[in-house]
Amino acid sequence: MSGSYPFIDIAALDSIREGFAKGDAQLVLTHDLSAVLWVNGPGAKLFGFDRVEDMIGGGLDLPIATRRQIASSNSNAEGETRTVSVRLGGGLRSDLTRFSVSHITLPDGVSGLLLTADGKDAEAEDIISGLSDDSTHIALIDANSRVIAASPRFAALDISSTTLEDLVIEAADATDRIVKRRIRAGKHSVPGAIARLTDTPPMHLLCIIGDAPVATLEAPAALQGEAEEILEEILPEPVESANTEDASTDQQKPRSFVFEQDAPPARFIWKVGPDGTFSEISPDLAATIGPNAADVVGRRFADVANVFGFDPDGSIAALLDKRDTWSGKRLMWPVEGTDLRVPVELAALPVYSRDREFTGFRGFGLVRPAEAEKDPEEIGLVLAGGIPQARKPVSEPVETATPVEDDDVLALGEEVANDDSPVATLPKPPLDIAPTPGRRESDKVISLLNACAEEKVAADQARMLKEREREERPEGGLTKTERNAFREIADRLRKQGLANSRAETETVAISDEPVIDSSQPVEKTEVKASLIDEVTADEASLPSSGMAYGDETALLANLPVPVIIHSGDKIHYVNQALLDLTGYESLDDIRGAGGVDVLFNSESDDGETRQGMVLRRANGSEEPVDAHLNAISWREGRALMLSLMPVAAAPVSVEAVAAPAEAPVAIDKDDEKQALADHVEELKTILDTATDGVVLIDPEGRIRSMNHSASALFGYERDETEGKFFSMLFAIESQRAAMDYLHGLSGNGVLSVLNDGREVIGREAKGGFIPLFMTIGKLPHTRGFCAVLRDITQWKRTEEELTNARKEAERASSQKTEFLARISHEIRTPLNAIIGFSELMADEKFGSIGNDRYRDYLRDINRSGNHVLALVNDLLDISKIEAGALDMQFEAVSLNDAIAEAIALMQPQANRERVIIRSSFQSNLPDIVADTRSIKQVALNLLSNAVRFTAPGGQVIVSTSYEMNGDVVMRVRDTGIGMTKSEVEQALKPFRQVNALERRKAETAKDWRSEGTGLGLPLTKAMVEANRAQFAIDSTPGHGTVVEIAFPPTRVLAD
C-alpha cells in the first residue's frame, strides 16, 4: 500500500490503535489539509473510496467551510480533542458526520491532524476492509491466535497456527507493540508484520506482503466460463511451429540455481527456538548456497547437522544447550547443485521474554563463497537432483519462439480471473488490449481481431521475443498505471447513467467502423488498411529510450473516459476524450489558458459556491461532472490521475418544458429555503441534546429562547421566559454579578477578550437555588448574547467535603499536639525527681550503700528515667514537626563544627562499646542555612544508631563533602548488622523497630532497654526535611548502613 509511512506503524500508535480495533473511521491529514497521510478502511469508505491506497498521498476534496472548521482545531494543545460536525456527500443528499479532531505525532516526528468518526456496529470484516490487494493480505488475530477476520486470499498463504501463536507472543513482548520479520507460509517465508492493537481483549493486526499460490487465485465459475467463451470467439488460428512444444517446455521449467563462487561474502540472520529448531533464516543464505540447501526452517539444528555433515563433534549443539553468548563457530555447508561446500561462520545471542523465559537464540552468519572446497560426500548434488544447467548468456539469440497468440490468451485469461469487478457489466471494447507476461511494456500487442492484425502480430514476433529476455513485465501482466486505468473504466462504465447518457454518442462513433459479429469466425472480419497503418505508425513513432512512457500514454489515449494526469497545478497529460469534452486543441492550449484553475470553477458567475464539480469548456460553457482521483506512478515520480464523467441529466417532464423560464429559479429557491430550514432544525436538535443549559439573550438583556436543558435546569417552560429579563434566572446576590458580566461583554472591553466565566447562584421556578458556572459569548449578527450554564452542584458538594476533611485533620493534629504537651509536663516532674534521687544515691553522699547489687539497681533506674524522658521529648518534637509548629532558627551553620561536637559527645559511649569513630571533613566547607539545634540532634541520632548497631571492633565513619553540583553532603557509614529494604521502610515509620534488633540482642546479650524506641530514624528524617535537605539511606544486611544528608545549593552559603 502506498504512503509515506508503513500502514501498520501508524495503526499501532496509542492514539489510533484502539479506535482502529473498534472500527472507527480514521484519517490523518497534514496541518494545512493538503494531503492525506494515512487512512483506514472505514475512513476511506466514508469519503467514497474503496481502497485506502487510492486515498493515501492524495488531496481531500472538502468544501471551504468544512476546511475552515477542521483547521480551527489546529490551535488545540497537544492531547486535546475537539468535536466538529462535517457534512459529507453532495447534491441534494448529504450526511452530517461528527469527527473528533486531535493532534497526532507520527513516527518520524511530523505532526498532523487525526480525524476520528465513531464506527457504529462495525463488524470485524469492516475493520480490514480496503486494505488488501493481490500482494497484501490482512487478518485480525485474537488472544488465542485464532483468525477473527481475514482478506479473501489470506487462507491461501497456509500459515500454521503455531506460527500465529509465536507472532502473538512476540507482539506481546515488543515494547513498541510491533514485530516485523519474515513469516513461514507453507513451504516458503514471506515478509510480514503484526501489531497488538488492544489488550482487553487482545486483538492483533497481521499484514503479509507476498503473492498467494496460483492454485488459490482461480476465478469464480461464472467468470471462468465467460472468459472461456470470449477466448473462443477472439482466438485466431494457432501458428504452427516445430519448436512450439520445446519452447513451452522451457517456459514451464523452473529456473535452476547457479552458484557464483566469485561472489563476495554474504551476511544472513538466523533464529532458533528453545528446542534448537530453526524458526527464521534471512533470504541472503538461500541466494548464496541455493534455496534447497537453506530450507531448514522448522527443523532441529541437530538433525540438519546430521544430514549435512557439519558439527561432527557436537560443539555448536552443546553451546545451544548452555544458553550463553557465543561466536566464531565455523562449519562447512553444502551448496545446492554442486559438489562443493562453503565455510559458514556463526554467532548467537540468547533471547529471553519479558518474564525472563528463554525463547531461543538470535544470531548472524557469514558465508564465504570464495573459500568453497570439494565436498567428498557431494550432498549439494542430491539437494538439486542432479547437475545444474549452465547459465545461458543474455545475448544468445532465440531461434524458436512460442506463438504470441498463446501468450496473449494466457494473459487475457489471467486478467479476467483477477478482475475484481463483474465482467458482465463491462461492455466489449472495439479493441482488445492484451498484455503479455514476461514482455516489456513497450512491446504490447494491440490485437484488432482480424486477419490483417494477425499478420502484423506474426511479423513482430521475433523482435518481441528477443526483448522479452531483457526486461520482464510485472506479475499480473499490467503496470500499475494500466491497472488503475482499467479499474477506473470498470467503475465508471458500471454506472447505468453512463450507458443512457452516452448511448447515442457511442452509436455515432462506432457507425464509421465495420461492426464485428461475434458469431462469425475472426478470419472473416474485414478491417480497413488505414487503421492498421495508423497502429503501425504509432508504434514506429515511439522512441526506443522511452517506450514505457509512450505505451502508458497510448493506453490512456484510447480510453473513452476523460483523464488528466497532474501534480498540483502542473498538468502532465490529457487524453483525447478530455480534449473533445472541453473543446481545446491540445495540452499546450490548456496550459496557456490557465491550467487546472481554468478547467474547474467552483463558483458561478454570481459568486455563489456550487455543491458539485463543474468543468468549464474552451467556449465558456460549463458541464457538471463526477470526478475520481487516484495516486499513480508517472514517469519517474508520483502524480494524480483525475478521471471525469459527465453527470447524467435528469428527465424533463412536459410540464417543466411548458413552464416559463422563471419556474426553475423558484424551485431552486424553495429547495434552498427547505435546506436552510432543515439545517436550523438540526442545530436546534444539537442544542437540545447538550447537557449544559443554553440561553439566547437579545441586546437589551431579555431572554429570546433556551434549550431543553436550560428549561429542565430552572423548571421553566420556554414560553414562560421569552421576553423577560435574563436576571430572573439568578438569586438576588448573583443578579448584579450576572448583569455586570453581560454589560462588560457588550462594551468591547477587557471582558470581551479575557472571557473566563463566572460562578453564580441560579434560582429555580419553585424558589430553590443552584450553584452554576456561566459563560457568555457574543452573537455576531444580531448583537445578542449566548449564555452557557453548567450545574456545579456536585463540584461544590465535593469541595465542601474536602474542606471539612481538612479542618477535621487539622483539629485532630492540634488535639494530639496539645495532649503530648500536657503529658510531657505531667511526666517530666516525677521523672526529674526519680533521675535526681537515683544520681544522688549512686554518689553515696549521705552514706555508703554497702551492696554492689543496689548500686546496679540505681544505675538501671537512672538509665530508664533518662530513656523515658528522651522518649517524651522525641514525641513532642515529632508532633511539632508534623503540625508545622517546630520552632526553627535558621542561621549560618558550620556543618563540620556541629558534627565534631556530636562526635565528642558520643565518643565515651563508642569507647565503652569498643567501636571506632573516624571522621573525614572537607576543608573550606561552606556554611549551610539551617537550625543549629536540629542539626546537632540529627548528627547525635545518626551516630547513636550507628554505634548501637555496630558490633565490637567495628567502625563508624563520618564525612562531609562539597559536590560538583553545589550540594553539601554529610555521610554516616557504619559496619554494623545492616537492614534489608523492607526493614528500612519499617524503621522509617514511627514506633516501629526492625526484627534485626532481636537478633542483635541475642548476639550481644545487651539490655533491651538500650535498644531505642523506634523514633530515632523517623525523627531524624523529619528534622532533615524541616531544614530543606534530602535524607537517603542505603543498607545491606551484614555489610552495614550508609545515611546521606544532602543540602541543596539554595541552602549553601558559597562564596
UniProtKB/Swiss-Prot annotation:
Q: Where is this region: Disordered?
A: 419-439
What GO MF terms are annotated?
A: ATP binding; histidine phosphotransfer kinase activity; phosphorelay sensor kinase activity
Which SUPFAM superfamilies is this protein grouped with? Answer: ATPase domain of HSP90 chaperone/DNA topoisomerase II/histidine kinase (SSF55874), Homodimeric domain of signal transducing histidine kinase (SSF47384), PYP-like sensor domain (PAS domain) (SSF55785)
Q: Which PROSITE patterns match?
A: HIS_KIN, PAS
The source's domain of life comes to: Bacteria
Per the annotation, which location comes first and is thus the protein's main one?
A: cytoplasm
EC number(s) recorded for this UniProt protein: 2.7.13.3
- Write out the ranges of the annotated region (Interaction with DivK): 627-1055
Q: Which UniProt keywords apply?
A: ATP-binding, Cell cycle, Cell division, Cytoplasm, Kinase, Nucleotide-binding, Phosphoprotein, Transferase
GO CC terms in record: cytoplasm; plasma membrane
Q: Which residues carry this modification: Phosphohistidine?
A: H825
State its location(s): Cytoplasm
Record Pfam families: HATPase_c (PF02518), HisKA (PF00512), PAS (PF00989), PAS_8 (PF13188), PAS_9 (PF13426)
Q: Which InterPro entries match?
A: HATPase_C_sf, His_kinase_dom, HisK_dim/P_dom, HisK_dim/P_sf, PAS, PAS-like_dom_sf, PAS_fold, PdhS_histid_kinase
Q: Which GO terms describe its biological process?
A: cell division; regulation of DNA-templated transcription
Q: What does this protein do?
A: Functions as a polar differentiation marker. Essential protein that, by localizing in the old pole of dividing cells, controls cell division and maturation, probably through control of DivK phosphorylation status and cellular distribution, which in turn regulates CtrA, a transcriptional regulator of the minB operon. The asymmetrical localization of this protein is probably required for cells to enter a new division cycle.
Q: What is this protein called?
A: Cell-division control histidine kinase PdhS
Naturally occurring in which organism (per UniProt):
Brucella anthropi (strain ATCC 49188 / DSM 6882 / CCUG 24695 / JCM 21032 / LMG 3331 / NBRC 15819 / NCTC 12168 / Alc 37)
